[in-house]
Amino acid sequence: MNIIDELEWRGAIYQQTDEEGLRKWVEEKQISLYCGIDPSGDSMHIGHLIPFMILRRFQNAGHRPIILVGGATGTIGDPSGKKEERKLQSMEQISKNVESLRVQLGKIFDFEGNSAASMVNNYDWTKDVSILDFLRDYGKEFNVNTMLSKDIVASRLEVGISFTEFAYQILQAMDFNHLYEFNDCRLQIGGSDQWGNITAGLDLIRKKQGENAKAFGLTIPLLTKADGTKFGKSEGGAIWLNPEKTTPYEFYQFWINTDDRDVVKYLKYFTFLTEAEIDELAKQVETEPHLRAAQKTLAAEMTKFVHSEEALEQALKISKALFSGDVKALTADEIEQGFKDVPTFVAEDSEANLVDWLVTLGIEPSKRQAREDVGNGAIYINGERQQDLEKIMDASDRIENKFTIVRRGKKKYFLVSYK
């Protein structure tokens, strides 16, 4: 299957320039193509992952991906999709973010073989461009009326936009032109909000490299959820690729909780499963939704891809323990990962009455509420229901003498460590 046909089947194309030309080009040649990300933070979230999944599909089809980390453009900030001016970050912070993103992106692509990926930083070719060179060599090629008509800029005209952000599309166009000239890069991929920036790059390439220069642009649809909420967010915030921000267990749980109405779409977008495999899972969503086979497959595939097989196994073990309530089977290390973001308390290394202990730690707001919850069977210690108001908490209630896991009700967990 032609890579363009595959992307269309997966619902991953929103707009493209010269569709037939691109289709023919990728059939006849191995091409280089790129996608960029600005280091506005020290970690990607799963929303950032979407265009890079497309880039990886091109690599699987035998093409050469170029991953651009925007050390230069990141100093300015892309106005796309922003209602107000971005706050500028220090160069030191941007440099740290660049390195963090390089590590994350390095896990997603293959950097060896005939279709080896490469990683570049646009700061390398932008840092020595003087303001006069910028205005003469590049600014001269851009018509202000055309720039104002771009959706990126037009949406900001009422509230105002600085020249810094207004000029962002010129810098991104410079990137595409540079990669075309020095890396034979023929295609830029981006989100649907990047169309204006991508077409600006194509215009610059034609002006700098000649009218016959062959270059293409492709954008990806905005991924939406069936319930109308923003993709990539959970109740706790963004789902990060950095395991210190979102543990592999939390990452796995995000995917396994996917709505039946969204799961087939996500399987197409995010996994490398074949059409036949996804069709089979789609049937199971219709006939046996309670088994959640599609969600389990999606969660497993994504956790392996972003983290590792070992991380998946650990996430499965934690999930099983929490589902069964047998949290005693978890090691202290697994508890630290699985309960990383639950409310955590530090208790004295001494015995105490359960009711007093819950109130002293702050798990319960009052003795009255604590007695009510214990008496009603709403309190679980290490997975075991405790209804004895006279129970004494001691060393036997600790896992590996480090942690006690408290559950209130069905889902509210607390982690207690000891001084």
Curated annotation (Swiss-Prot):
The lineage of its organism: Bacteria, Bacillati, Bacillota, Bacilli, Bacillales. PANTHER family: TYROSINE--TRNA LIGASE, MITOCHONDRIAL (PTHR11766:SF0), TYROSYL-TRNA SYNTHETASE (PTHR11766). L-tyrosine binds at Y34, Y168, Q172. Keywords: Aminoacyl-tRNA synthetase, ATP-binding, Cytoplasm, Ligase, Nucleotide-binding, Protein biosynthesis, RNA-binding. ATP binds at K233. A motif ('HIGH' region) lies at residues 39-48. GO terms for molecular function: ATP binding; RNA binding; tyrosine-tRNA ligase activity. It comes from Listeria monocytogenes serovar 1/2a (strain ATCC BAA-679 / EGD-e). Pfam families: SYY_C-terminal, tRNA-synt_1b. This is Tyrosine--tRNA ligase. InterPro entries: aa-tRNA-synth_I_CS, aa-tRNA-synth_Ic, Rossmann-like_a/b/a_fold, S4_RNA-bd, S4_RNA-bd_sf, SYY-like_C, Tyr-tRNA-ligase, Tyr-tRNA-ligase_bac-type. The gene is tyrS.
